[in-house]
């Protein structure tokens, strides 16, 4: 259990990586004077042949890595990695389960933390949180739009994603995921997910995502249709109270 603990993650997906594109991965420590806030590490994937950025990930580790001078850079050197749409302070981090349900969050997932998803210390591995957030989206979408809105020609593409940890799930924990729509306008939708531990009701992780409405045939972003927007607006979270 000596690995650095991840506290916050902010991911941006800048470009689509096509099949057979050569990938080059990089990991750096961030200088304290880099205007990156509390983030102290940066990882990114780029095209190994031309340097085109595919995705980037800012991390805040509770135990910063001891990086050599050659592996420390400023966020200003890769401005595309800086937060863009998810930069405000979100009220969802302070919500208890009952308050979240009152605000319009719905149950989108439940389960048991299994041993095969945990590390040697019995903690749920970081990638598993992302997977469970992804698994909750179809259930949220059914709540928002119904099964009849499933389409082979249109979907969504996540452009930005952030998650904040307040604790850790352990092997044997029972969890509940609550999800909701924060905003819908133009070509974008903004979703939120809350991961609670059953029993004591502790909020373990909150996550938010900005998704772009995406035409799967043209591979381009598209406007949310007026009828769909109307239905989405009627199911939007009430986070003002």
Give the positions of each predicted feature.
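Catalytic strand-loop segment that frames the active site of acyl-thioester-processing enzymes
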Residues: 1, 85-147
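Hydrophobic, proline/glycine-rich low-complexity stretches
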Residues: 1-22, 134-137, 141, 145-149, ...
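Small beta-barrel nucleic-acid-binding modules, principally OB-folds
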Residues: 2-16, 153-170
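Short loop/turn motifs at secondary-structure junctions and domain boundaries
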Residues: 6, 107-109, 158, 185-187, ...
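HotDog/MaoC-like acyl-thioester-processing domains
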Residues: 13-22, 28-99, 165-171, 181-241
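Hydrophobic pocket/interface hotspot
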Residues: 121-123, 179, 219
């Amino acid at each position: 259990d000596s690995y650095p603990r991840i506290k916050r993650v902010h991911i941006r997906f800048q470009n689509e990586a096509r099949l057979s594109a050569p990938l080059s991965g990089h990991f750096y420590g961030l200088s304290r004077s880099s205007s990156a806030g509390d983030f102290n590490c940066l990882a990114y994937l780029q095209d190994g042949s031309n340097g085109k950025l595919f995705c980037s990930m800012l991390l805040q580790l509770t135990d910063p890595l001891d990086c050599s001078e050659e592996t420390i850079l400023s966020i200003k050197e890769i401005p595309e990695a800086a937060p863009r749409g998810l930069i405000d302070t979100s009220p969802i981090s302070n919500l208890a389960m009952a308050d979240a349900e009152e605000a319009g969050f719905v149950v989108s997932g439940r389960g048991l933390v299994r041993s095969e998803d945990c590390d040697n210390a019995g903690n749920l591995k970081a990638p598993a949180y992302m997977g469970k957030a992804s698994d909750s989206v179809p259930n949220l979408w059914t709540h928002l739009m119904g099964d009849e809105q499933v389409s082979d020609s249109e979907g969504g593409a996540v452009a930005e994603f952030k998650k904040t940890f307040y604790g850790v799930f352990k092997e044997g924990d029972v969890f509940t995921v609550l999800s909701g729509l924060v905003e819908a306008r133009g070509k974008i939708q903004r979703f939120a997910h809350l991961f609670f531990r059953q029993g004591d009701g502790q909020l373990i992780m909150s996550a938010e995502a900005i998704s772009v409405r995406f035409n799967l045939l043209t591979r381009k972003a598209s406007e949310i249709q007026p009828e769909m927007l109307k239905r989405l607006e009627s199911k939007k979270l009430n986070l003002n109270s």
